[in-house]
Amino acid sequence: MRTLLDLDPKGKRVLVRVDYNVPVQDGKVQDETRILESLPTLRHLLAGGASLVLLSHLGRPKGPDPRYSLAPVGEALRAHLPEARFAPFPPGSEEARREAEALRPGEVLLLENVRFEPGEEKNDPELSARYARLGEAFVLDAFGSAHRAHASVVGVARLLPAYAGFLMEKEVRALSRLLKDPERPYAVVLGGAKVSDKIGVIESLLPRIDRLLIGGAMAFTFLKALGGEVGKSLVEEDRLDLAKDLLGRAEALGVRVYLPEDVVAAERIEAGVETRVFPARAIPVPYMGLDIGPKTREAFARALEGARTVFWNGPMGVFEVPPFDEGTLAVGRAIAALEGAFTVVGGGDSVAAVNRLGLKDRFGHVSTGGGASLEFLEKGTLPGLEVLEG
């Protein structure tokens, strides 16, 4: 993989694909983590004498939509990088090209949301060529988007000398440790809503791991596959056989699987609703399981004891609605308390839990990519990485 150390930026206009897909509310950025993570790459290039053109997406607009403008991101970036300014032009436009060509060394230009361009997600070759006119070299530092074969990730990288930024390199180095000779015992904690989102990563990791802890709504598909009564809990009915098969494979490989013993349940998902705790395999209708229960939190903490490598992706419950965030926070605390282990967390809610607990420094690596980290662990590569090799 070509990295920043292979690029001499002096006097060059460098096009950088960053991941500024951050939460914005009332025109203000709510979490600057991804902006801060991009700064080492940007500062390195500026110190080397480059001018920079930045590309990013924000949300999933269906074309130009002021609610998804990068203007608030430009404001937040400027607070950390005074050289930066936002230009409200779609990156494939003539105006964007003129703005880019007028840049002097040391200047930074953030263009409008790449997803305002109709060809971005189709990896349109013509749009990729228009992006390529914005710079003389391309740096991919958007790990969170590296699993998407889009024009600003893959298309433009084929048309310019392309390099991995520092964040990209850091992510690949950390996640590779989870695949190549990880220190044992190795525990994986998976949560979130759907088994279908995690099948690939479970199949890839099963031969490498010792313990698999499953929480979140996806646990109910496994519990029902084992004959449990799960009330109105979310179940993927078309994945019951697959869940049973995965449990059988885990057993054959000697992997110990931990499923919830009890759950916090309610009749509907809303803050302050009346809750009950039930055994995970005996949830009565009309209740649905919305978080792992107190016994499960203790059991999961015990299951993590002594682990030397841990990967965690996905919340243990409906994290955004208290009190169903307790299980996720408990798992975050248990992993952070491990001494001498290499611990990696990825995925929006899991990372949000770690940040809320103020325990980011207690993790070996906090990944900026949820879907990207899962796909990397499943396949060992990503579309955005493949174009940087050679």
From Swiss-Prot:
CDD domains xrefs: Phosphoglycerate_kinase (cd00318)
Top EC class, one word: transferase
Binding positions (substrate): D19, Y20, N21, R34, H57, L58, G59, R60, R115, R148
UniProt keyword terms in alphabetical order: ATP-binding, Cytoplasm, Glycolysis, Kinase, Nucleotide-binding, Transferase
Entry GO terms, CC: cytosol
Residue ranges of coiled coil: none
EC number(s) given by UniProt: 2.7.2.3
Transmembrane segments: none
Positions contributing to ATP binding: K198, G289, E320, G347, G348, D349, S350
Record bears the keyword Kinase: yes
Single GO molecular function: ATP binding
Pathway this chain belongs to: Carbohydrate degradation; glycolysis; pyruvate from D-glyceraldehyde 3-phosphate: step 2/5
GO BP, one annotated term: gluconeogenesis
Catalytic activity, reaction form: (2R)-3-phosphoglycerate + ATP = (2R)-3-phospho-glyceroyl phosphate + ADP
Entry's localization field: Cytoplasm
Subunit structure: Monomer.
Family: Belongs to the phosphoglycerate kinase family.
The protein, known as: Phosphoglycerate kinase
Organism field: Thermus thermophilus (strain ATCC BAA-163 / DSM 7039 / HB27)
